[in-house]
């Protein structure tokens, strides 16, 4: 088994050099000696990539698992401590591995076969009826509430921030994201009723109410998020403007068949819908949106067409999740009768967001390990590293799609966006009229 993995590594490592410490005590180097300069930073605050990395495999059983199912086994072995980085960070190790994967996966027959099988099985993995969706959400979002306060910003924005210059703090960039979205919602007057699908801990809803005078109904499938969102609303004295419900988007028509919302926003929730449910999602948005209303969808997408979710991510992080390509999202939008009035692609913004999360997680690692354990920390660190690299290496991005039912619902050009970002002039006192 070890010989088979050695043969694969010899062919696979064509960029940089990887040193492997085997269970039998031998050490083998693969690839060329690092004699070329590091690449320039793609964004502010991020250096070049490591060219010489290493790892140790601590038992022969792990080798068998990696050969049988590398996408799942490597993540499990790193989380268990059966594979450990040597002479480098986890980020450095994965960065070089991902670069080699990108260079070789498309031409290697095993890589092509794995991609085909993954795509064939994705509808099964993403079958998310209402009951399963609730369990999937609880798996990730109903963790100990302290965890998220230890690496997210103060507002607990668990989605891509907006870095206009790259020098912003996480708090500044997350605030900019919310106002960027608010501008696209065309909140041109107070009292507009907004539906927030997948409201998280309530940060977006509270911002729209506090700064724009909107009335907001937020829905979530997470009991922990619902509790926190309601508590925050009460503490800010915004109960008269903001309400939160434990509700699936598919149940909106049954709960309020005649209600229409002036605006609808969904941030970081669409990734949990599943490809077989895209039509149902956009049909629900279309039914709930006022004829002159505006909706904004903010979600992670793929840059190179349809794909499949890593089995490790599916098993341990986001069961039922999938980040679609635009080519998979636009057809169900068209079938729903909605009009895509604007599309913006945010490329490296999420890489920078996750870099901030990784640093905060590392700074609070001892506290998090006391809440959970070291294995959980290794698992979560791997999730953050892998996610950041997916955006840095151009396989993932974030799209914001503005939707409407009428061609005249939004301005003719984008010129309104900068001024609309600064329209947050309604104080909490002024909002009390609505």
Language-model features: where?
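A short acidic, Gly/Pro-enriched loop at the edge of an enzyme's catalytic core
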Residues: 250-264
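Conserved class I S-adenosyl-L-methionine
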Residues: 190-198
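A short glycine-rich, Lys/Arg-flanked "PGG" loop and its adjoining helix->strand segment in the class I
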Residues: 279-291
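Conserved SAM-binding loop of SAM-dependent methyltransferases across substrates and taxa
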Residues: 201-212
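Conserved beta-strand signature within the Rossmann-like core of class I S-adenosyl-L-methionine
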Residues: 292-300
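Substrate-binding/catalytic lobe of Class I Rossmann-like enzymes that use SAM or dcSAM, i.e.
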Residues: 300-411, 418
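Conserved SAM-binding strand-loop segment of SAM-dependent methyltransferases
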Residues: 236-251
């Amino acid at each position: 088994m070890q010989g088979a993995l050695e043969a694969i590594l010899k062919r696979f490592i064509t960029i940089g050099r990887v040193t492997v410490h085997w269970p039998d005590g031998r050490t083998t180097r693969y690839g060329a000696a690092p004699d070329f300069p590091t690449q320039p930073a793609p964004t502010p605050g991020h250096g070049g990539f490591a060219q010489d990395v290493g790892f140790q495999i601590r038992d022969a059983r792990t080798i068998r698992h990696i050969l049988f199912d590398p996408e799942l086994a490597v993540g499990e072995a790193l989380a268990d401590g059966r594979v450990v980085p040597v002479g480098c960070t986890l980020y450095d190790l994965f960065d070089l591995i991902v670069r080699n994967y990108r260079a070789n996966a498309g031409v290697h027959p095993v890589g092509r076969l794995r991609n085909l099988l993954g795509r064939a099985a994705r509808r099964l993995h993403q079958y998310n009826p209402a009951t399963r969706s609730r369990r999937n959400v609880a798996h990730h979002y109903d963790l100990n509430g302290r965890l998220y306060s230890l690496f997210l910003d103060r507002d607990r924005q668990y989605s891509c921030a907006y870095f206009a210059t790259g020098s912003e703090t996480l708090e500044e960039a997350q605030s900019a994201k919310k106002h960027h979205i608010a501008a696209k919602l065309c909140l041109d007057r107070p009292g507009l009723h907004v539906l927030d699908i997948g409201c998280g801990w309530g940060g977006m809803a509270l911002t729209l109410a506090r700064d724009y005078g909107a009335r907001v109904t937020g829905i979530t499938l997470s009991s922990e998020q619902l509790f926190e969102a309601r508590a925050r609303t009460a503490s800010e004295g915004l109960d008269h403007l903001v309400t939160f419900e434990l509700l699936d988007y598919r149940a909106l028509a049954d709960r309020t068949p005649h209600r229409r919302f002036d605006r609808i926003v969904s941030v970081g929730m669409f990734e949990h819908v599943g490809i077989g449910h895209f039509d149902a999602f956009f049909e629900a948005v279309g039914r709930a949106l006022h004829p002159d209303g505006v909706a904004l969808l903010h979600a992670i997408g793929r840059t190179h067409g349809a794909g499949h979710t890593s089995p490790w991510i599916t098993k341990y992080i986001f069961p039922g999740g999938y980040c679609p390509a635009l080519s998979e999202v636009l057809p169900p939008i068209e079938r729903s009768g909605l009009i895509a009035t604007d599309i913006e692609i945010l490329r490296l913004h999420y890489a920078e967001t996750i870099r901030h999360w990784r640093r905060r997680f590392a700074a609070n690692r001892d506290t998090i390990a006391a809440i959970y354990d070291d294995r959980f920390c290794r698992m979560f660190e791997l999730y953050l590293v892998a996610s950041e690299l997916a955006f840095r290496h151009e396989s993932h991005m974030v799209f914001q799609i503005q939707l409407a039912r009428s061609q005249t619902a939004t301005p003719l050009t984008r010129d309104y966006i900068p001024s609309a970002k600064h329209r947050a002039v309604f104080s909490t006192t002024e909002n009390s009229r609505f």
